Amino acid sequence: MIKRTISGMIGKGSLAHNRREFFAENVEPDRVQLNICYQNENLKEVYKELFDDAVGRYNIGKRKDRQITNYYEKIRQGKQEKLFHEVIFQIGNREDMAVGTAEGDLAVKILDEYVKDFQKRNATLRVFGCYLHQDEATPHLHIDFIPYVIDWKEKGMDTRVSLKQALKSLGFQGGNKHDTELNQWMNHEKEVLAEIAKQHGIEWEQKGTHEEHLDVYNFKKKERKKKVQELEQEKEYLTAENEELTAQIAESRADIQILKDDKE
Protein backbone atom coordinates (compact mmCIF):
# COMPACT_ATOMS: atom_id res chain seq x y z
CA MET A 1 0.00 0.00 0.00
CA ILE A 2 1.51 3.32 -1.09
CA LYS A 3 0.57 6.67 0.44
CA ARG A 4 -0.57 9.65 -1.59
CA THR A 5 -2.28 12.95 -0.83
CA ILE A 6 -5.81 13.57 -2.06
CA SER A 7 -6.69 17.13 -3.04
CA GLY A 8 -10.13 18.64 -3.39
CA MET A 9 -10.44 22.35 -4.04
CA ILE A 10 -12.78 25.02 -5.38
CA GLY A 11 -11.85 25.99 -8.93
CA LYS A 12 -12.10 29.33 -10.70
CA GLY A 13 -14.64 27.97 -13.15
CA SER A 14 -12.89 28.80 -16.42
CA LEU A 15 -14.97 26.88 -18.94
CA ALA A 16 -12.75 27.94 -21.83
CA HIS A 17 -9.71 26.52 -20.02
CA ASN A 18 -11.49 23.29 -19.15
CA ARG A 19 -12.67 22.84 -22.73
CA ARG A 20 -9.21 23.72 -24.04
CA GLU A 21 -10.50 26.59 -26.14
CA PHE A 22 -7.11 28.13 -25.36
CA PHE A 23 -3.85 26.70 -24.02
CA ALA A 24 -2.39 27.98 -20.76
CA GLU A 25 1.38 27.97 -20.32
CA ASN A 26 1.33 24.80 -18.24
CA VAL A 27 -0.58 22.80 -20.87
CA GLU A 28 1.26 20.41 -23.19
CA PRO A 29 -0.62 20.69 -26.55
CA ASP A 30 0.68 17.33 -27.79
CA ARG A 31 -1.06 15.59 -24.87
CA VAL A 32 -4.47 17.26 -25.24
CA GLN A 33 -5.82 14.16 -27.00
CA LEU A 34 -5.33 12.25 -23.73
CA ASN A 35 -7.95 14.38 -21.97
CA ILE A 36 -11.31 12.78 -21.23
CA CYS A 37 -14.52 14.79 -21.66
CA TYR A 38 -17.37 13.20 -19.72
CA GLN A 39 -19.85 16.05 -20.06
CA ASN A 40 -19.82 19.31 -21.99
CA GLU A 41 -23.25 20.95 -22.07
CA ASN A 42 -24.27 24.52 -22.77
CA LEU A 43 -24.76 26.34 -19.47
CA LYS A 44 -27.67 28.48 -20.68
CA GLU A 45 -29.50 25.44 -22.01
CA VAL A 46 -29.12 23.62 -18.71
CA TYR A 47 -30.52 26.68 -16.93
CA LYS A 48 -33.59 26.46 -19.16
CA GLU A 49 -33.92 22.75 -18.40
CA LEU A 50 -33.72 23.29 -14.64
CA PHE A 51 -35.58 26.54 -14.12
CA ASP A 52 -37.94 27.45 -17.00
CA ASP A 53 -40.93 25.67 -15.45
CA ALA A 54 -40.24 27.30 -12.08
CA VAL A 55 -40.00 30.72 -13.75
CA GLY A 56 -43.39 30.11 -15.35
CA ARG A 57 -44.96 29.19 -12.01
CA TYR A 58 -43.36 32.18 -10.29
CA ASN A 59 -44.62 34.66 -12.89
CA ILE A 60 -48.27 33.61 -12.58
CA GLY A 61 -50.26 36.52 -11.18
CA LYS A 62 -47.21 38.81 -11.02
CA ARG A 63 -47.22 42.27 -12.53
CA LYS A 64 -45.08 42.47 -15.64
CA ASP A 65 -42.40 44.55 -13.91
CA ARG A 66 -42.16 41.89 -11.18
CA GLN A 67 -41.81 38.91 -13.50
CA ILE A 68 -38.56 37.09 -14.21
CA THR A 69 -37.82 37.10 -17.93
CA ASN A 70 -34.41 35.42 -17.92
CA TYR A 71 -33.29 33.53 -14.81
CA TYR A 72 -29.79 32.95 -16.18
CA GLU A 73 -29.26 36.70 -16.55
CA LYS A 74 -30.85 37.38 -13.17
CA ILE A 75 -28.26 35.15 -11.48
CA ARG A 76 -25.40 36.38 -13.67
CA GLN A 77 -26.06 40.01 -12.88
CA GLY A 78 -26.93 39.46 -9.23
CA LYS A 79 -24.68 39.01 -6.23
CA GLN A 80 -26.71 36.43 -4.36
CA GLU A 81 -25.40 33.28 -6.09
CA LYS A 82 -22.86 32.24 -8.71
CA LEU A 83 -24.00 30.88 -12.07
CA PHE A 84 -22.13 27.66 -11.35
CA HIS A 85 -19.40 26.20 -9.18
CA GLU A 86 -16.34 24.13 -9.95
CA VAL A 87 -14.43 21.56 -7.93
CA ILE A 88 -11.07 20.00 -8.79
CA PHE A 89 -9.84 16.64 -7.54
CA GLN A 90 -6.34 15.21 -7.74
CA ILE A 91 -4.36 12.30 -6.31
CA GLY A 92 -0.72 12.93 -5.42
CA ASN A 93 1.40 15.50 -7.24
CA ARG A 94 3.84 15.88 -10.10
CA GLU A 95 6.53 14.18 -8.04
CA ASP A 96 4.70 10.94 -7.33
CA MET A 97 1.72 10.71 -9.74
CA ALA A 98 2.98 12.43 -12.89
CA VAL A 99 1.24 12.16 -16.24
CA GLY A 100 2.83 9.49 -18.42
CA THR A 101 4.01 7.29 -15.56
CA ALA A 102 2.47 4.07 -14.26
CA GLU A 103 1.42 5.96 -11.12
CA GLY A 104 -0.18 8.69 -13.24
CA ASP A 105 -2.11 6.09 -15.22
CA LEU A 106 -3.36 4.66 -11.93
CA ALA A 107 -4.53 8.11 -10.85
CA VAL A 108 -6.50 8.40 -14.10
CA LYS A 109 -8.16 5.04 -13.46
CA ILE A 110 -9.15 6.03 -9.91
CA LEU A 111 -10.49 9.45 -10.92
CA ASP A 112 -12.43 7.83 -13.75
CA GLU A 113 -14.11 5.45 -11.30
CA TYR A 114 -14.81 8.26 -8.86
CA VAL A 115 -16.50 10.60 -11.31
CA LYS A 116 -18.88 8.05 -12.78
CA ASP A 117 -21.08 8.06 -9.67
CA PHE A 118 -20.64 11.75 -8.84
CA GLN A 119 -24.00 12.87 -10.25
CA LYS A 120 -25.82 9.95 -8.62
CA ARG A 121 -24.36 10.89 -5.21
CA ASN A 122 -25.03 14.58 -5.70
CA ALA A 123 -28.49 14.87 -7.24
CA THR A 124 -28.87 18.58 -6.42
CA LEU A 125 -25.57 19.52 -8.06
CA ARG A 126 -26.42 19.42 -11.78
CA VAL A 127 -23.19 18.63 -13.61
CA PHE A 128 -22.89 20.23 -17.04
CA GLY A 129 -19.12 20.09 -17.52
CA CYS A 130 -16.71 17.35 -16.49
CA TYR A 131 -13.14 16.91 -17.74
CA LEU A 132 -10.16 14.76 -16.79
CA HIS A 133 -6.98 16.55 -17.84
CA GLN A 134 -3.81 14.68 -18.67
CA ASP A 135 -2.04 17.46 -20.57
CA GLU A 136 -0.63 19.11 -17.45
CA ALA A 137 1.86 17.79 -14.88
CA THR A 138 -0.56 15.65 -12.84
CA PRO A 139 -3.89 14.05 -13.84
CA HIS A 140 -6.79 15.97 -12.30
CA LEU A 141 -10.54 16.25 -12.60
CA HIS A 142 -12.64 19.39 -13.19
CA ILE A 143 -16.34 19.16 -12.34
CA ASP A 144 -18.61 22.14 -13.13
CA PHE A 145 -22.10 22.11 -11.65
CA ILE A 146 -25.19 24.19 -10.88
CA PRO A 147 -26.36 23.77 -7.27
CA TYR A 148 -30.13 24.03 -6.92
CA VAL A 149 -32.96 23.34 -4.52
CA ILE A 150 -36.48 22.15 -5.33
CA ASP A 151 -39.73 22.62 -3.39
CA TRP A 152 -38.43 25.86 -1.86
CA LYS A 153 -41.16 27.13 0.48
CA GLU A 154 -39.91 30.65 1.14
CA LYS A 155 -39.84 33.77 -1.04
CA GLY A 156 -38.99 33.46 -4.70
CA MET A 157 -39.09 30.58 -7.16
CA ASP A 158 -39.83 27.07 -5.87
CA THR A 159 -36.81 25.73 -7.78
CA ARG A 160 -33.80 27.99 -7.57
CA VAL A 161 -30.01 28.25 -7.50
CA SER A 162 -28.58 27.84 -3.99
CA LEU A 163 -25.32 26.19 -3.02
CA LYS A 164 -26.14 26.20 0.68
CA GLN A 165 -29.60 24.68 0.26
CA ALA A 166 -28.41 22.19 -2.37
CA LEU A 167 -25.82 20.84 0.04
CA LYS A 168 -28.32 20.78 2.89
CA SER A 169 -30.59 18.67 0.69
CA LEU A 170 -27.71 16.19 0.45
CA GLY A 171 -27.49 16.01 4.24
CA PHE A 172 -24.70 18.49 4.97
CA GLN A 173 -26.15 20.79 7.61
CA GLY A 174 -23.09 22.84 8.51
CA GLY A 175 -21.81 23.59 11.98
CA ASN A 176 -19.58 26.41 13.11
CA LYS A 177 -17.89 28.87 10.76
CA HIS A 178 -15.04 26.45 10.10
CA ASP A 179 -17.40 23.56 9.44
CA THR A 180 -19.67 24.82 6.67
CA GLU A 181 -21.86 22.73 4.39
CA LEU A 182 -19.24 23.09 1.67
CA ASN A 183 -16.41 21.94 3.94
CA GLN A 184 -18.41 18.93 5.07
CA TRP A 185 -19.34 18.01 1.52
CA MET A 186 -15.79 18.40 0.22
CA ASN A 187 -14.43 16.19 3.00
CA HIS A 188 -17.06 13.58 2.22
CA GLU A 189 -16.15 13.55 -1.48
CA LYS A 190 -12.47 13.20 -0.63
CA GLU A 191 -13.36 10.23 1.55
CA VAL A 192 -15.24 8.66 -1.36
CA LEU A 193 -12.21 9.19 -3.59
CA ALA A 194 -9.91 7.82 -0.89
CA GLU A 195 -11.99 4.65 -0.59
CA ILE A 196 -11.71 4.03 -4.34
CA ALA A 197 -7.97 4.74 -4.21
CA LYS A 198 -7.62 2.24 -1.37
CA GLN A 199 -9.12 -0.45 -3.57
CA HIS A 200 -6.24 0.21 -5.96
CA GLY A 201 -3.52 0.03 -3.33
CA ILE A 202 -3.27 3.72 -2.42
CA GLU A 203 -3.69 4.96 1.15
CA TRP A 204 -4.75 8.56 1.75
CA GLU A 205 -1.87 10.54 3.21
CA GLN A 206 -3.83 13.27 4.95
CA LYS A 207 -2.36 16.72 5.35
CA GLY A 208 -1.06 17.38 8.82
CA THR A 209 0.24 13.87 9.47
CA HIS A 210 3.83 14.90 8.79
CA GLU A 211 3.86 18.40 10.24
CA GLU A 212 6.51 17.34 12.75
CA HIS A 213 8.98 17.24 9.87
CA LEU A 214 8.46 20.92 9.10
CA ASP A 215 10.47 23.53 10.88
CA VAL A 216 8.53 25.88 13.15
CA TYR A 217 8.55 28.80 10.70
CA ASN A 218 7.18 26.79 7.79
CA PHE A 219 4.58 25.12 9.98
CA LYS A 220 3.24 28.46 11.25
CA LYS A 221 3.30 29.88 7.73
CA LYS A 222 1.26 26.93 6.46
CA GLU A 223 -1.22 27.25 9.33
CA ARG A 224 -1.68 30.98 8.67
CA LYS A 225 -2.36 30.31 5.01
CA LYS A 226 -4.91 27.66 5.91
CA LYS A 227 -6.62 30.05 8.35
CA VAL A 228 -6.83 32.79 5.70
CA GLN A 229 -8.42 30.35 3.23
CA GLU A 230 -10.99 29.30 5.83
CA LEU A 231 -11.84 32.92 6.64
CA GLU A 232 -12.19 33.82 2.96
CA GLN A 233 -14.52 30.89 2.43
CA GLU A 234 -16.58 31.83 5.47
CA LYS A 235 -16.76 35.43 4.28
CA GLU A 236 -18.14 34.23 0.95
CA TYR A 237 -20.84 32.20 2.68
CA LEU A 238 -21.84 34.97 5.08
CA THR A 239 -22.00 37.45 2.21
CA ALA A 240 -24.24 35.09 0.23
CA GLU A 241 -26.53 34.57 3.23
CA ASN A 242 -26.75 38.31 3.89
CA GLU A 243 -27.52 39.08 0.26
CA GLU A 244 -30.19 36.37 0.20
CA LEU A 245 -31.89 37.90 3.25
CA THR A 246 -31.57 41.40 1.78
CA ALA A 247 -33.15 40.23 -1.46
CA GLN A 248 -36.03 38.58 0.42
CA ILE A 249 -36.64 41.75 2.46
CA ALA A 250 -36.59 43.90 -0.68
CA GLU A 251 -39.01 41.54 -2.40
CA SER A 252 -41.39 41.61 0.59
CA ARG A 253 -41.30 45.42 0.68
CA ALA A 254 -42.03 45.54 -3.03
CA ASP A 255 -45.01 43.20 -2.57
CA ILE A 256 -46.32 45.41 0.24
CA GLN A 257 -45.98 48.48 -1.98
CA ILE A 258 -47.84 46.72 -4.80
CA LEU A 259 -50.68 45.88 -2.40
CA LYS A 260 -50.78 49.52 -1.27
CA ASP A 261 -50.84 50.74 -4.89
CA ASP A 262 -53.61 48.29 -5.80
CA LYS A 263 -55.62 49.37 -2.76
CA GLU A 264 -55.30 53.02 -3.69
Each language-model region and where it sits:
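N-terminal nicking endonuclease/strand-transfer module with a His-rich metal-binding environment
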Residues: 1-264
